[in-house]
């Protein structure tokens, strides 16, 4: 995210070069860590940048990137769908050896 205070985008971008796969895409979302990642597409709050060139400096990548309105989620969903298998039903939690302790989301999330 452009103004991310946890994972600076230029550092994240340089990390992509160290990934072995040639099938990789860097997408930069607008805003900060939470707002740029967590906001769902329905909020239509922030855009994102893409650039197929991967051998550039972070500044050059940004300068020549295309800006897109709306969430980066649909782009990620399309990428992930191409790499995923078919949808399967979720398993039923619990077993004789490991019974369910409480229904989701669990009691620990309500603890203070």
Predicted regions and their residues:
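C-terminal subdomain of alpha/beta-hydrolase-fold enzymes, centered on the catalytic histidine
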Residues: 1-112
